[in-house]
């Protein structure tokens, strides 16, 4: 067999965005090439050894519902699992896992090496091949030219990356890896709008030099141990380990303040903006000067290493200051640092220059995903990667792009925020960013997206069969609870009092009882000596059984709220998905201010919904725009219901 140099899709970069992009494109049936500077670092967790969290866990569940790899890889490598906000409402509950770095990489690589239609090749990319307004391939550092109809660029922090430790700095994509300087220069030649951002990582500590007797232990959830994937099982997890907690103190803060004159952040050496919600320890001490202590989590890096990740002290201070501040904390008085912390500056490109499909507006067939779009976090990268890979595959197949809506997925919220609002700092997902978060829960990500994923070609038979069984079981059990009744005569007073606090005074369905505060699904099913439970088990697998029960309980308890949110979505839908013509000149829209028309002409929103979320575009301006479209007969809805069903709900035409 000759060495292949022609592909449908090329993915550049093998991080969390690149691996999901390559897998998605290949699952679509596109002949896909993944180019990485080092095959050994495929799926590498460059910073913290954890997956998930508030908002982030929602994205991981959505990637999983669409057939992605991150959740399943976490189940196979997770050494601690926790449900965050477990005492709060279902909208904000989130799964978080500590992962063994080596096992996680192995799980991702196994999937890549066994994915049909996917080729791997180790070479850094120095150039993109562009003909006119189209990308046609990529050129590696030794001059190999690979041609393709679509390219997905997932360069992470590698584009002209510069690493800072104190006032020393050097080029690098991350510690131990070279920066992509030539590729960065080439992208700048293409006149794509770009800027600089910054992120950082803490020093790593040898666990053998930590005095754990002085620390507070933080175990994971053990009964039961959570799973991330909808197909996951708790017996997939390796050995579980605790995390540990220490704190900074006034001496720590004094040490940090004393080192600020050699901090690249506070001496103007670093120009890029860092992440607001994952600040360096220098920023914490400066911004929260009155706070006497900050909590620091010591997280194990894996089962076969003594290395610990001190979550909360990301820093670019000089190494001697890092050593002193670590030794100032309880339990770390004699700690040995294995790797220094550092900050890294890198190029990103203004995501407002992207379509909602993550294809660049300027160059057809070129897609961006991950930190190149101004986001931070493994989960945000993976979600974008899956979407970009999917749409690159659909692009070469001459099919319409799939662009999830804000009311459909956190992925839709993420992309819409990026392409309409841009970023002034690294973007991180939170549940607070989603206006329809009661409908966008972790637990129902498969109910929202797996059917769409099946239509798009992302979901295999095994996942589809498991989902279908779950969906049907939830539907049957919900209907059973609605149609099963108890009366004062059939429900013993003592049972009613134990469950409800008092006897019932008239006939109730089991669903009506379940809606009451403090009443659980198991409590209702246990009435009348268990006679109110299902005649047959809902599922044999205990994880699936809990998922079904959770879906049934939430669906019934929150039915009224969910229906009201659905009505709100329907009211907003008319304008949200009205498409804007590609060639419209907003200066011709009567009544629009110069500022608004200038912004609309600059950012070229694809829909009325996107236009309404651009900073400075007022509701009055949207009304004028709607009148203009109606007068000219230009506005059109985003496809019929039948088309949406055929394309996967939320499809928009690809401009080719």
Swiss-Prot record:
GO terms for cellular component: cytosol. It is found in: Cytoplasm. InterPro entries: FAD/NAD-bd_sf, GIDA_C_N, MnmG, MnmG-rel, MnmG-rel_CS, MnmG_C, MnmG_C_subdom, MnmG_C_subdom_sf. NAD(+) binds at residues 274-288. GO terms for molecular function: flavin adenine dinucleotide binding. Gene3D superfamilies: FAD/NAD(P)-binding domain (3.50.50.60), GidA associated domain, C-terminal subdomain (1.10.150.570), tRNA uridine 5-carboxymethylaminomethyl modification enzyme MnmG/GidA (1.10.10.1800). It comes from Burkholderia cenocepacia (strain HI2424). Pfam families: GIDA, GIDA_C_1st, SAM_GIDA_C. The keyword Cytoplasm applies. Homodimer. Heterotetramer of two MnmE and two MnmG subunits. Its cofactor is FAD. This is tRNA uridine 5-carboxymethylaminomethyl modification enzyme MnmG. Keywords: Cytoplasm, FAD, Flavoprotein, NAD, tRNA processing. HAMAP family: MnmG_GidA. The keyword Plastid does not apply. GO terms for biological process: tRNA methylation; tRNA wobble uridine modification. PANTHER family: GLUCOSE INHIBITED DIVISION PROTEIN A (PTHR11806), PROTEIN MTO1 HOMOLOG, MITOCHONDRIAL (PTHR11806:SF0). FAD binds at residues 13-18. Belongs to the MnmG family. Its main location: cytoplasm. NAD-binding protein involved in the addition of a carboxymethylaminomethyl (cmnm) group at the wobble position (U34) of certain tRNAs, forming tRNA-cmnm(5)s(2)U34.
